[in-house]
Amino acid sequence: MTEDLPGLIRHFAGQKQKVFFVHFRDVFGDRHHFIETFHDEGPTDMYACMRAYAEAGFNGPLRPDHVPALEGETNDSFGYTNLGRLFAIGYISGLREAAYGRHPTNYRSA
């Protein structure tokens, strides 16, 4: 949706210090018509975004936003399935560990 999302993150989370809470997700499409994807399936370089948060010194809460359903889930609570959320948390944790470093005091869990 933007050509330089990591640059925007560094600007607003770092220089402006205007990011206080992050809903982390990826989508296909534009702001009018989009489909939410798993964090590792969309067009965005999610690691570059996480690295931008780290470089900006962001230390606030970060959580997955809506997630697609995995095989076997009913999707009764669209966007909030248990297995999809577990996958997202694991993926985000890996990105965060890679971007911020392994030591748990380098970031605060969301």
Question: Which ranges hold each PLM region?
Answer:
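Histidine-acidic metal/acid-base catalytic patches
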Residues: 1-110
